[in-house]
Amino acid sequence: MSKRIYNFNPGPAALPLSVLEEIQATFLDFAGTGMSITEVSHRSKPFDAIINDAVTRVKRLLGIGDDFKVLFVQGGASMQFAMVPMNLLPDGKSADYVNTGTWSTKAIKETKILGKTVNVAASSEDRNFAYIPKELSLDPNAAYVHITSNNTIKGTQWADFPDTKGVPIVSDMSSDILSRPLDMSKFGLIYAGAQKNIGPAGVCMVIVKNDLLEKANTGLPSMLAYKTYADSNSLYNTPPCFTIYAIDLVLKWLEETIGGLEKMDAVNREKAALLYDLFDASSFYNGTADADSRSLMNVTFRLPSEDLEKRFVEEATKNDLGGLKGHRSVGGCRASIYNAMSMEGIQALVDFMKEFERTNG
């Protein structure tokens, strides 16, 4: 096998090596068909088994039953910024949105473009999105409360979800889906672009409660209506079969290799602690998120100067530590440590950071 680096890119991101190896082994002959998964019909029995297995595994991991539908939708999380209000926000009602960064800002913008009424229930923009708000001004009559569970750019994450007094939470979980157990009774809909934590790019997983589906707005274009996907098992048109196959393998890895979401959460906390403990003991590395809002998925930090940050990224890359440059909108550095990032990768990064501080501090 050719050399592989430790991939800290924010998305598309690292996949479990065992998943990549299984894809490699089956790529030319999928399930004894004599065809690649990229050639198999989405109407075939072999692919039907894949998509059904993926749905079953998601439900098992999250502990949900037939009161939820699991959908595979194209267009990424960005399309969900519009699909959510199109389907779930009736005329004459408003929705609560909590603004914690770039992606929730975009979700608010798309909702307003549709002429829908938005109540910004809280925002952390006053301090450049460095924290998760604790005080929310929620409307008890809102159609839903929209939350971005993890903020990849600023490195913040909801540690606990708010009590919305029965109003369903709609959450963009693109960057922390299936990284920890969830109390699914709080959620009406979860959406997650695949390319950060559950697979390659090309599909957005939507987990939606049946009661929201049943009262969803009608008169929408077919491809923008959740009901279309729910009624067709996400096979209304040709889905990205390869991506869904890879997602199914990642779900299998989560269940059978990791042992479920509680164990995944424990591993993720241990990984993040190695980096945050380093920050807390150093005056050279400074985390950008408030301590009580730190993300377990995206660890953002600054060095004493931009020149040092540039050198840090360059030298890290030479040491097979890739993808550590911060988002172009904020600069700095960022280590994305999703489920698939190994403890060995984190330790290699910590060792490099200590040596870089020793020689440049």
From Swiss-Prot:
Keywords: Amino-acid biosynthesis, Aminotransferase, Cytoplasm, Pyridoxal phosphate, Pyridoxine biosynthesis, Serine biosynthesis, Transferase. Pyridoxal 5'-phosphate binds at residues 77-78, 103, 152, 172, 195, 237-238. GO terms for cellular component: cytoplasm. InterPro entries: Aminotrans_V_dom, Pser_aminoTfrase, PyrdxlP-dep_Trfase, PyrdxlP-dep_Trfase_major, PyrdxlP-dep_Trfase_small. SUPFAM superfamilies: PLP-dependent transferases (SSF53383). It is found in: Cytoplasm. Pathway: Amino-acid biosynthesis; L-serine biosynthesis; L-serine from 3-phospho-D-glycerate: step 2/3; Cofactor biosynthesis; pyridoxine 5'-phosphate biosynthesis; pyridoxine 5'-phosphate from D-erythrose 4-phosphate: step 3/5. Binds 1 pyridoxal phosphate per subunit. Its cofactor is pyridoxal 5'-phosphate. It holds the Pfam family Aminotran_5. One of its GO terms (biological process) is pyridoxine biosynthetic process. Catalyzes the reversible conversion of 3-phosphohydroxypyruvate to phosphoserine and of 3-hydroxy-2-oxo-4-phosphonooxybutanoate to phosphohydroxythreonine. Belongs to the class-V pyridoxal-phosphate-dependent aminotransferase family. SerC subfamily. This is Phosphoserine aminotransferase. It comes from Desulfosudis oleivorans (strain DSM 6200 / JCM 39069 / Hxd3).
